[in-house]
């Protein structure tokens, strides 16, 4: 009954818009529907990725085999660290593009994404600390420093983006003089290098293949 009522109301609104607004109104409605579908699809993809990580965590919590728990924890850390690097790469690109093109909407989107990512990362970190408590004690002592270094690195990436974004928003929002073209020309190759570095770091962490780590560190 509720679904039928909602469908009737939507149909009535669309017919009204078509009657009074004609083709332009219908075009706007179609654009709005397309935006909603794309946005919902993006959110669904993000939720599915988080659910995959949560499934891995549930397996980790249920496991009573310390060797299996360690293997699951490694997989969990690889996924979460890879997710943070993917987020960092995308957000860094949005911030720099927003600054270069004076796009305030793009900068605001990056600001909201950073706040969301802070909450997501805190949940991941708490879960992985639980995992560290379930593995063999001596192994936990051995890996503890490296684990927290990885956590702190991910945290610093997120907060580094926030600190970088703040002056960019201030610059664009206050209508300061746009960046000169020669500054932009100098910035673009640097952005490309950072983008390649983050993608290569993500690939190495998620696959566990660090053969090219030295080459990446010197780029």
Regions found by a protein language model. Name each.
Residues 1-2:
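Helix-loop-helix junctions within the multi-pass membrane cores of secondary transporters/permeases
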Residues 25-30, 109-110:
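Composition- and surface-driven signal marking solvent-exposed, interaction-prone regions
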Residues 28-39:
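Hydrophobic core of alpha-helical transmembrane segments in multi-pass integral membrane proteins
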Residues 41-218:
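Cytosolic, long alpha-helical scaffolding segments
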């Amino acid at each position: 009954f509720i679904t039928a009522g909602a469908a009737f109301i939507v149909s009535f609104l669309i017919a009204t818009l078509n009657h009074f607004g004609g083709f332009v109104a219908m075009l706007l409605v179609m654009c709005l529907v397309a935006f909603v579908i794309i946005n919902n699809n993006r959110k669904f993809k993000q939720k599915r990725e988080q659910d995959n990580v949560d499934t891995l965590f549930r397996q980790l919590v249920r496991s009573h085999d310390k060797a299996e728990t360690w293997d699951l924890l490694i997989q969990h850390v690889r996924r979460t660290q890879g997710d943070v690097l993917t987020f960092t790469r995308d957000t860094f690109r949005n911030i720099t593009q927003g600054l270069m093109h004076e796009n305030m909407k793009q900068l605001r989107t990056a600001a909201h994404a950073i706040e969301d990512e802070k909450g997501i990362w805190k949940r991941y970190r708490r879960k992985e600390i639980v995992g560290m408590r379930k593995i063999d004690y001596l192994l936990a002592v051995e890996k503890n420093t490296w684990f927290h270094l990885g956590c702190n690195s991910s945290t610093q990436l997120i907060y580094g983006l926030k600190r970088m974004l703040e002056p960019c928003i201030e610059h664009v929002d206050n209508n300061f003089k746009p960046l000169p073209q020669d500054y932009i020309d100098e910035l673009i190759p640097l952005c490309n290098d950072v983008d390649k570095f983050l993608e290569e770091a993500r690939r190495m962490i998620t696959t566990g293949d660090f053969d090219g780590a030295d080459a990446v560190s010197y780029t």
